[in-house]
Amino acid sequence: MAVFKKKKTSLTSLFLGCYKAKNASKYEGGEKAVMKIRTCPAFKRLSLSDISDPSSPMSVMDDLSHSFTSQKLRLFTLSELRVITHNFSRSNMLGEGGFGPVYKGFIDDKVKPGIEAQPVAVKALDLHGHQGHREWLAEILFLGQLSNKHLVKLIGFCCEEEQRVLVYEYMPRGSLENQLFRRNSLAMAWGIRMKIALGAAKGLAFLHEAEKPVIYRDFKTSNILLDSDYNAKLSDFGLAKDGPEGEHTHVTTRVMGTQGYAAPEYIMTGHLTTMNDVYSFGVVLLELITGKRSMDNTRTRREQSLVEWARPMLRDQRKLERIIDPRLANQHKTEAAQVAASLAYKCLSQHPKYRPTMCEVVKVLESIQEVDIRKHDGNNNKEGKKFVDINKFRHHRKGKRRVNIAYSDSLVYKESKAKQNDGI
């Protein structure tokens, strides 16, 4: 875990006049609803660097209690979470990721007075895993302040002794990973796959276009959650980073992420930009098109890396038909598949300056959806909306010289519990 220096400046000065503070007394056993924001046009989103001592739980709790947000985050006690999850019963377990196990639970006003009755997902930190207090705090700082229909909603959190827990809205269809790769599951229709791709793209575009940009850094199928209507929402912001501001072109950081999804220039140099997320999106789009995992050691050596094997075939119509998920049969429209494949090809460019922005990605996917809807309704009017041509977007970003730096502490993070080929 990173070591942080304690800052002397209080957060109070950042929010003077913007918040109505409540009494910040003892936290054990009692609810501490985090502050509501008053009308404050100069509101600045908090970052990890704004916390006076990120490594100290009590300092963090004190800073949070004086700071945000309009979303009314709830502080849960460990005893309340035991009630919600039936004592963290294995029968309630939904899955397990890099942060730790996730349980299904239910909350109502008997547990928390005034709270809406609803199912929830409770994610508890694995004290022996790869992640810890910093990732828990990052999750609160990002999802506690950012609100969008394509980001999973954070309801509250728990911080008692070494325990770190997060409480989210429950997503009935689970992760895209499970829906796409689980054995014996029904094949997802082409239209559903493109709907999910569009929703996830809108989530990334929202982060990248924020006044203070956010780089998600760990975009993959297991972090895309689906509601009952297959609306996609991004989850797990433990590895997210604030993007470069002003004249800065990138953020330099230790390489983190998941094998098979991180952009090559990020792995090579540790230079992080929004283009890393665009590359990761291209990997997921390729998985949606082919129905294959990004990395699979059970495949032939030539095909183990999906990107290396499939990308060269994305621009050849005859070869493209060979790599499209055979479970789709004739569901997909040839032209729509070609547009999606061309988009994936662009996102997976080795040079970041040739990748589209996420806003451009959204425009292409929206055109696919609109044309598909029109054809489904029997409206084949040639004067109607056409596919957006990704090749016509101008490369307005300045090219950057690639610097080959081998970071001695670089690490491509792998999930603590190997998920590949285990039937999940």
UniProtKB/Swiss-Prot annotation:
Keyword NAD appears in the UniProt entry: no
Keywords of the record: ATP-binding, Cell membrane, Kinase, Membrane, Nucleotide-binding, Plant defense, Serine/threonine-protein kinase, Stress response, Transferase
Gene Ontology annotations for the cellular component aspect, listed alphabetically: plasma membrane
Gene Ontology BP annotations: defense response
One Pfam family it belongs to: PK_Tyr_Ser-Thr
GO molecular function: ATP binding; kinase activity; protein serine kinase activity; protein serine/threonine kinase activity
Induction and repression of expression: Induced in roots by exposure to air, abscisic acid (ABA) and salt treatment.
Enzyme superclass (EC): transferase
Listed name of the protein: Probable serine/threonine-protein kinase PBL12
Source organism of this protein record: Arabidopsis thaliana (Mouse-ear cress)
